Curated annotation (Swiss-Prot):
Belongs to the PafC family. Part of the pafABC operon, but PafC does not seem to be involved in pupylation or substrate degradation. Appears to play at least a small role in resistance to reactive nitrogen intermediates (RNI) in vitro. The gene is pafC. PROSITE patterns: WYL (PS52050). Interacts with PafB; with which it probably forms a heterocomplex. Disruption phenotype: Cells lacking this gene are not severely sensitized to RNI and display no accumulation of the proteasome substrates Mpa, FabD and PanB. Residues 131-211 form the WYL domain. One of its GO terms (cellular component) is peptidoglycan-based cell wall. It comes from the Bacteria. This is Protein PafC.
Amino acid sequence: MSALSTRLVRLLNMVPYFQANPRITRAEAAAELGVTAKQLEEDLNQLWMCGLPGYSPGDLIDFEFCGDTIEVTFSAGIDRPLKLTSPEATGLLVALRALADIPGVVDPQAARSAIAKIAAAAGAVAAVAEQAPTESPAAAAVRAAVRNSRALTIDYYAASHDTLTTRIVDPIRVLLIGGHSYLEAWSREAEGVRLFRFDRIVDAAELGEPAVPPESARQAPPDTSLFDGDLSLPSATLRVAPSASWMLEYYPIRELRQLPDGSCEVAMTYASEDWMTRLLLGFGSDVRVLAPESLAQRVRDAATAALDAYQAAAPP
């Protein structure tokens, strides 16, 4: 837990603590709370600035100091159990359900347990414990390795090259980018930080050794530039039929214009022409390449080759 989070937890517990220990001395309070006298003074000054909306003197948390003792005179309700409003509970449930369905971000069982408790506390109709989504053994192994700081061996499918490789990595953290979970890890083979998408990790197993990514890699902020528009990458102009419009939510696509028939023209960046060709073949006639011509020709050639192979394999 970060220092900021630790202080927040301490501040939230200080008012109930002082109410349970009226007229406790500063020295005793500092010792029991595990802080210095200076930190206790800073915490009390911070609490003095917290309270109910309006934030006038009568709305803020207040203390009475008698000699060296401390007593709460107005708690601003911070001593009462937290109660969520209906919109707050609904928003929290929606967020938890979304997180529970994304591999690797949270423990699915813990998330579903929290969902059931919040739904019951909020008075949801027929609140029942929801079954946690099935987590793949690979995702569970990766999450455990991150939690335990253990090195991993993974079998990873690289969509851009259509290959399955085995790699040894030192996990750093799990990231959520564009609705997908990624393992950020130090690749010993590449000697650099790499991102591995959870749904492309075919198998994973902890090694009997600690994860030892370089300290510079561990401390550096996540590099998500791959998911930003990179002007150095080639771009294709595509015409997307309404039936394939869902692809706009899953790929680095910028919509150019809507057409009268409901289709749209888009610009899509890509790093590998091989990968782009395979992707477009999967959409059939729903996605047509308008530019560049080299990519359009490559897709046509690949489609013709596939059709010829199919006809050759067909029984006479």
